[in-house]
Amino acid sequence: MPEINASNLDEKQVQLLAEMCILIDENDNKIGADTKKNCHLNENIDKGLIHRAFSVFLFNTENKLLLQQRSDAKITFPGCFTNSCCSHPLNNPGELEENDAMGVKRAAQRRLKAELGIPLEEVDLNEMNYLTRIYYKAQSDGIWGEHEIDYILFLRKNVTLNPDPNEIKSYCYVSKEELKEILKKEARGEIKLTPWFKIIADAFLFKWWDNLNHLSPFVDHEKIHRM
């Protein structure tokens, strides 16, 4: 395995590697906890380590989707464009609650504040729509990767943004047509997308986006989409 040289990594992002993520099996049953670092090392992923995660898709009242470009300081997928917010619930009582994915929603509220500066009071947990779950695995480089079951959360409202530059390099709201152009740029190798965002955009996103006012037919809390 390639050596990890922490001196090459951002200090703040290294501190976050100590956070305790939720270990799960392939059916999203909690089986333990481990550090964010251990969860994202390819050597552990290759042994089957899986953790719980979430992806927020935040739309404004014009039905435009907030995209972010991950900062160059990020340890996994730096500089990649992705959906509004992507992270992990932590192994604590508030974020472990599984009823209506309330634990994941609390984690999303926390990270929307940490990454995008959205005030907590602007993110009502009851306004988040938990649609479904996606299981995937992807390498970032020779050392780091992802292996997770990703809870898909939709939220539509206008919010106050004050992004943390250590987390986010840039951001923008896009229409469906603008996102299609971004996907074409990615296909030409002009920009990079995170693997989970590309999976979701290719397989599900536009269908969901077309039905923002009627998402209930797409809610499936039983199935885990294995991509």
From Swiss-Prot:
Cofactor(s) essential for the protein? Mg(2+)
Record's Gene Ontology CC terms?
A: cytoplasm; peroxisome
Where do the annotations place Mg(2+) binding?
40, 51, 146, 148
Q: How is the cofactor bound?
A: Binds 1 Mg(2+) ion per subunit.
- Which keywords does this Swiss-Prot/TrEMBL entry list? Acetylation, Cholesterol biosynthesis, Cholesterol metabolism, Isomerase, Isoprene biosynthesis, Lipid biosynthesis, Lipid metabolism, Magnesium, Metal-binding, Peroxisome, Steroid biosynthesis, Steroid metabolism, Sterol biosynthesis, Sterol metabolism
Active site feature = 86, 148
Name of the protein in its database record: Isopentenyl-diphosphate Delta-isomerase 1
Q: What is the lineage of its organism?
A: Eukaryota, Metazoa, Chordata, Craniata, Vertebrata
Gene for this chain: Idi1
